[in-house]
UniProtKB/Swiss-Prot annotation:
This is Probable phospholipid-transporting ATPase IIB. PANTHER family: PHOSPHOLIPID-TRANSPORTING ATPASE IIB-RELATED (PTHR24092:SF50), PROBABLE PHOSPHOLIPID-TRANSPORTING ATPASE (PTHR24092). Residues 500-525, 552-574 are annotated as: Disordered. The lineage of its organism: Eukaryota, Metazoa, Chordata, Craniata, Vertebrata. Its EC number is 7.6.2.1. The gene is atp9b. GO terms for molecular function: ATP binding; ATP hydrolysis activity; ATPase-coupled intramembrane lipid transporter activity; magnesium ion binding. Residues 500-511 have a biased composition (Low complexity). The keyword Cytoplasm does not apply. NCBIfam families: ATPase-Plipid, ATPase_P-type. The active site is at residue 455. InterPro entries: ATPase_P-typ_cyto_dom_N (IPR023299), ATPase_P-typ_P_site (IPR018303), ATPase_P-typ_TM_dom_sf (IPR023298), ATPase_P-typ_transduc_dom_A_sf (IPR008250), HAD-like_sf (IPR036412), HAD_sf (IPR023214), P-type_ATPase_IV (IPR006539), P-type_ATPase_N (IPR032631). Its main location: Golgi. Its cofactor is Mg(2+). It is found in: Golgi apparatus, trans-Golgi network membrane.
Length: 1125
């Protein structure tokens, strides 16, 4: 009975707790004030944790949504939420998601698959022929304003509600929908072509009868596929064989994870040993693989061959996989397909990023809702003044239709076209070459930023690693003393070579050392340097690649002498970490060169040209959790087995033997801005290694909890290791980082640096880059692990004023768990914040916290795959295409090539985009309000009749050819030159207050519209003769001229295209007068009376506004006008 009692019984009524893990932040926790962190359960099921995390994300919204009820909520989007919820329930009811399971795949026998797997077809299309029109219409009419215009247009089919010609209302709506449909159709055709091109690619499929050609879309689970060099891998596969003698190949993964370095993949040993390809069908073998998952960096599976006695079992890991969307870089590979279609890693990781909506769009939406309310109120007032006579509800709806132009239907089209123009200008700017706009809907966000969250490595720094320091505990070597290390290496290997050439003669060695005491010291230093350099040259995942080998030339790796191929000048090093490449290049510079590497051995070339061979027994790759990597090698000459390991100081401190210098020297190097690695070794006997190998192989064959079991076995070996050295690698700053950060700081942008590096290194880079000024105090947040410590440290931080904050990821996690609001409030008051040891999840969490607790816009910038979540979470994401690949660049809204380009991107293009869109939006709304004011005046004078003032082509032409081009030309306007905007970044600070588009400016434009509309209408009524048609001709012509003059008075910097737009619009109107005899009296509009009446009305409507603008600019000029003058 005792076996059935759980060790940690948990009552069902216990309070909700969160999974506590240093690698991922606990986001939400409900507990009492007196709770103790030590009383929390250490583990929680993955499902429970995900539920707990999602509860945190949805709980605040749930509380808010409870208050969002009623008519206002429904009109502002509640109807859309309700419809979407109903559709989602219907979809889930009709089509349940298939449960993913582990599977057994037989080599070359897809018919043996127990289940039906997805078709291997790439489908990025949103619609098909049947669903295109309904789908696009739904996407448009799910917005309230578009639905409103549709209802207004449909109302014209009702005779009692009809105001004028049908095309008066249907033509603008049709134009907007046509533009949208054409744009969607073009994008859909492009997606269809790309999908068809990818799905039609031919691959060689291995069958019993030989090779056959098969399309990518026809590949099935269990097929044996042959992939040539430089060919894309069509589906997720297990690597079985290769044409390379080494049994391995390189793949390029830049389209999968964004990393440009080649990755080494290893074929299954059992199938690699088969004599010919056809033998794959003569064996009975299968692979058992885990269910499809998102993680592209891990894999668990087993290979089994049954036709042997005993059966052969091999464990499979990430090194045996070939994921789809990667490219074979060397040789020809054969693999068995295990996942296809939507179950492939690349497809599962392709998620739709959130549709980012700019702050300006949200502000315009609020203004249009205010206009809608004003339209309804105005219609009610007109009906009330009419006395609610007759069918007043019908008249109410007719007035709503008459005043529908208050809400401009062309607003969205104009803004979208303007955004496209801004994107084109950004990409054509020669001062920021290589800049790409990937999200064209938010260029105005670049002009409203308050917080900039930046990565360090590769963003502020060049990601160009240079070896700078080697510390042995008692002696340190820098760049100016590397020749001493080189001389020690030459001496050490010269002695070894001399001893080997003289055989077992013992007399030759003392003859070289006539002074016993001194040589003992030199020998001690030389041997320590020798061991350290050898460990650095062996402990890595770097592979030397020669141009001749990549191109297919077969070199003999078994050569034991200095080979011509080994001295090839075209040798390059491939590795997933630039730090490792820097270390290997340094060992080459001091005399110990890595010349060859395959699956089983490493070869080093000594300064004398001798080739030393080391057999690779085991490799333990670097992971973000372990923060270290190791290798076990056997030296060919002596047979000695040595376990080498290197890693971060926090991971290695508890592994190496006791010492009194490691922690201090790590801090010293970090203060110099160096990235540190601790190197250690451990000698193993044959018995020790055999015992370890047996336990390790048994753990690797486990399907369940394999990683935990393997880690436990490896940790049993990581004890009392001998500390060899500490290395320091420098990552130099990007060009013009200091002036760029100074520019951003003067623009009122607060800069937060989020990095995974250690605290000392991050602080040093913050100082050297002038992120933190040298005379500014820095508060280093002490490590905290519980609520009490966090409370005390926050109180200490609260007493500091105007100081930069430096905090680690672990302490940040504790603060956010207990004092989220208080911490964010204090941190936002700091001029700069540095968060070190941050995980990618924490970076994104910090972005979301700033969005939730402040009303300001955030921008995230980075260059690596670990920055993608932060970039996608920010209001504006900027990616740098750098050494770590293109993943951040591809996921970002804007892509740049250097950090310094962000200055011009924000100060010039961001500022101009915001001010231009603000002016464009208000002008389009002004164009609708002025004609609605004229309609209101006209109806009020003629006994509140719901009769249109203008009909037919006049209304259509007014919103299109007569005024569209001059108004849209505002996207070319600029208040100051780009040089002045960069010289005076304080101009950018004014934009964050949103004064260019606010309720104040909106009310000013409303008053202008009422004044001008009243003047135009009353003037035309006062000056007209006996014919009503004269009122229409005078008022409409004056309206067109007023709009053109208002645009001209608003422009601050003229462009030749603006002049052309004005002339074209005026010419179009004058030319159309000959065809408007249905609306105008042609004999009247050619008289002088018509001309002077139009001129007087136009002058009265515009001149007072110009005088007021001139006086305001003279006595209270804006900041930009002071610079432009």
């Amino acid at each position: 009975m005792a076996d059935g009692i759980p060790l940690n019984p948990v009552r069902k009524n216990l309070r909700k707790t969160a999974y506590y893990d240093a690698s991922r932040p606990a986001r939400y926790q409900i507990e009492d004030e007196s709770s103790n962190l030590d009383e929390m359960p250490l583990m929680m099921s993955e499902e429970a944790f995900e539920n707990d995390e999602s509860d945190y994300q949805t709980l605040p919204r749930a509380r808010v949504s409870q208050r969002r009820r009623g008519l206002g909520w429904f009109l502002c989007g509640g109807w859309k939420v309700l419809c979407s919820s109903c559709c989602e329930c219907l979809v889930h009811t009709c089509r349940r998601k298939k449960e993913l399971k582990a599977r057994t795949v037989w080599l070359g026998h897809p018919e043996k698959c127990e289940e039906k797997y997805p078709k291997n077809a790439i489908k990025n299309q949103k619609y098909n022929i049947v669903t295109f029109v309904p789908g696009v219409l739904y996407q448009q009419f799910k917005f309230f304003l578009n639905l409103y215009f549709l209802v207004v247009a449909c109302s014209q089919f009702v005779p009692s509600l009809k105001i004028g010609y049908l095309y008066t209302y249907w033509a603008p709506l049709g134009f907007v929908l046509a533009v949208t449909m054409v744009r969607e159709a073009v994008d859909e055709v492009r997606r269809c072509r790309r999908d068809k091109e990818m799905n039609s690619q031919l691959y060689s499929k291995l069958t019993v009868r030989g090779k056959v050609q098969v399309k990518s879309s026809d590949i099935q689970v269990g097929d044996l596929i042959i992939v040539e060099k430089n060919q894309r891998i069509p589906a997720d596969m297990i690597f079985l064989r290769t044409s390379e003698k080494t049994g391995s190949c390189f793949i390029r993964t830049d389209q999968l994870d964004g990393e440009t370095d080649w990755k080494l993949r290893i074929g299954v040993a059992c199938t690699q040993r088969l004599p010919a390809l056809g033998d794959l069908f003569s064996i009975s073998a299968y692979v058992y693989v885990q269910k499809p998952q998102l993680d592209i960096h891990s894999f668990e599976g087993n290979f089994t061959r049954e036709d042997c006695d005993p059966p052969i079992h091999e464990s499979l890991s990430i090194e045996n996989t070939l994921w789809a969307s990667t490219v074979v870089a060397s040789g020809t590979v054969i693999g068995v397909v295990i996942y296809t279609g939507k179950e492939m890693r690349s497809v599962m990781n392709t998620s739709q990023s959130k549709n980012k909506v700019g702050l300006l769009d949200l502000e315009l939406n609020r203004l249009t809702k205010a206009l809608f309310l004003a339209q309804v109120v105005l219609s009610v007032v007109m009906v009330a003044l009419q006395g609610f006579l007759g069918p007043w509800f019908r008249n109410l709806f007719r007035f709503v239709v008459l005043f529908s132009y208050i809400i401009p239907i062309s607003l969205r089209v104009n803004l979208d076209m303007g955004k496209s123009a801004y994107g084109w200008m950004i990409m054509k700017d020669e001062n920021i070459p290589g800049t790409v706009v990937r999200t064209s809907t938010i260029p105005e966000e670049l002009g409203r930023l308050v917080y900039l969250l930046t990565d360090k490595t590769g963003t502020l720094t060049q990601n160009e690693m240079v070896f700078k320091r080697l510390h042995l505990g008692t002696v340190s070597y820098g760049t100016d003393t590397m020749d001493e290390i080189q001389s020690h290496i030459i001496q050490s290997y010269a002695q070894v070579s001399s001893a080997q050439s003289n055989g077992s003669s013992a007399s030759s060695t003392p003859s070289r050392k006539p002074q016993p005491p001194a040589p003992k010291v030199r020998k001690s230093v030389s041997s320590r340097i020798h061991e350290a350099v050898k460990a650095i040259a062996l402990c890595h995942n770097v592979t030397p690649v020669y141009e001749s080998r990549v191109n297919g030339a077969n070199a003999e790796p078994e050569s034991t002498e200095a080979d011509q191929d080994f001295s090839d000048d075209n040798r390059t090093y491939q590795a997933s970490s630039p730090d490792e490449v820097a270390l290997v290049r340094w060992t080459e510079s001091v005399g110990l060169t890595l010349v060859n590497r395959d699956l089983t051995s490493l070869q080093l070339k000594t300064p004398a040209g001798q080739i030393l061979t080391y057999y690779i027994l085991q490799i333990f790759p670097f992971t973000s959790e372990s923060k270290r990597m190791g290798i076990i090698v056997r030296e060919e000459a002596t047979g000695d087995i040595t376990f080498y390991m290197k890693g971060a100081d926090v991971a290695m401190a508890s592994i190496v033997q006791y010492n009194d210098w490691l922690e201090e020297e790590c801090g010293n190097m970090a203060r110099e801005g160096l990235r540190t690695l601790v190197v250690a070794k451990k000698s193993l006997t044959e018995e020790q290694y055999q015992d370890f190998e047996n336990r390790y192989n048994q753990a690797k064959l486990s399907i369940h909890d394999r990683n935990l079991k393997v880690a436990a076995v490896v940790e049993s070996l990581e004890r009392e290791m001998e500390l060899l050295c500490l290395t320091g690698v420098e990552d130099q700053l990007q060009a013009d980082v200091r002036p760029t950060l100074e520019l951003l700081r003067n623009a009122g942008i607060k800069i937060w640096m989020l990095t995974g590096d250690k605290l000392e290194t991050a602080t040093c880079i913050a100082k050297s880059s002038h992120l933190v000024s040298r005379n500014q105090d820095i508060h280093v947040f002490k490590p905290v692990s519980n609520r009490g410590e966090a409370h005390l440290e926050l109180n200490a931080f609260r007493r500091k004023h105007d100081c930069a904050l430096v905090i680690s990821g672990d302490s940040l996690e504790v603060c956010l768990r207990y004092y989220e609001h208080e911490f964010v409030e204090l941190a936002c008051q700091c001029p700069a914040v540095v968060c070190c040891r941050c995980s990618p999840t924490q970076k994104a969490q910090i972005v979301r916290l700033l969005q939730q607790h402040t009303a300001n816009r955030t921008c995230a910038i980075g260059d690596g795959g670990n920055d993608v979540s932060m970039i996608q979470a920010a209001d504006c994401g900027i990616g740098i295409e750098g050494k770590e690949g293109k993943q951040a660049s591809l996921a970002a809204d804007f892509s740049i090539t250097q950090f310094k380009h962000i200055g011009r991107l924000l100060m010039v293009h961001g500022r101009n985009s915001y001010k231009r869109s603000a002016a464009l939006g208000q002008f389009v709304m002004h164009r609708g309000m002025i004609i609605s004011t004229m309609q209101a005046v006209f109806s009020s004078i003629f006994y509140f009749a719901s009769v249109p003032l203008y009909q037919g082509f006049l209304m259509v032409g007014y919103a299109t050819i007569y005024t569209m081009f001059p108004v849209f030309s505002l996207v070319l306007d600029q208040d100051v030159k780009p040089e002045m905007a960069l010289l005076y970044p304080e101009l950018y600070k004014d934009l964050t207050k949103g004064r260019s588009l606010s309720f104040k400016t909106f009310l000013i434009w409303v008053l202008i519209s009422i004044y001008q509309g009243g003047i135009l209408m009353y003037g035309a009524l006062v000056l007209f003769d006996q014919e009503f048609v004269h009122v229409v001709a005078i008022s409409f012509t004056a309206l067109i001229l007023t709009e053109l003059l208002m645009v001209a008075l608003t422009i601050r910097t003229w462009h030749w295209l603006m002049v052309v737009a004005q002339l074209i619009s005026l010419a179009c109107y004058l030319a159309s007068l000959a065809f408007l005899n249905e609306y105008f009296d042609l004999s009247f509009i050619t008289t002088r009376v018509f001309l002077w009446k139009v001129c007087v009305i136009t002058l009265v409507s515009c001149l007072p506004l110009y005088i007021i603008k001139y006086l305001k600019r003279k006595f209270s000029p804006p900041s930009y006008s002071k610079l432009s003058s």
